[in-house]
């Protein structure tokens, strides 16, 4: 758990540093119009001296202009670090239950748990990028970046094929395939998570589906539900802490998680509106993407 906490904390710092050039660019190029309007509306007793304020804004602009090129030079290091760190804490999340063979149902307990959690996080990551990109395109009325998303979608089915091969091959090696089709409580949850991932990823083998925003969205949702359920199965459904011990998240815990998600959505909306997160459509060849999207969707 210490390793997981340390990796997540470090990873969060790395993500902030990766995003910092965008913030610095905004500080350097912005006219600070909203901030100036806010200051102008302050009561005279609270309003700062305008000349000093203008000087401080110029200082912030100049500092941002000096720091950003320096950060750009070392950004590749943080990008590599940002890719490496998740492989550590994601596999560690699987390793946590290696010491509990008597408490985790045999359908999920395996020596391959670190590998399965690592592959699981990768295909979930690609799927959430597809889901978020499509939702953002509709929410902010931007063209869907179908070319880039279809490229990601080509990778997902092969990753899930490896994951499913390890899952099913391990069950066969441990003589647990019969337990997987017993259709009891644990078997149903196992089949549900495997089925959702298999169906969602299997759809992406078809080129027409990969070029259809609607079907890309459906497949991403199925994979996310199946991949997320796999983790619930390992840590909640299939885990038995022992006689007299039970655990399920309380309403307060669930609401805290919901609040975190709501805060992340709010922060996302603020950031994409305040800093240049989205690329300019005219500079990235998406002027005709709406037409391409509709044509490909009809073909699918």
Task: Please describe what each predicted stretch is.
Residues 1-209, 282-288:
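Long, contiguous internal "core" modules enriched in hydrophobic/ aromatic residues
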Residues 207-208, 212-300:
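TerminUS-proximal long segments
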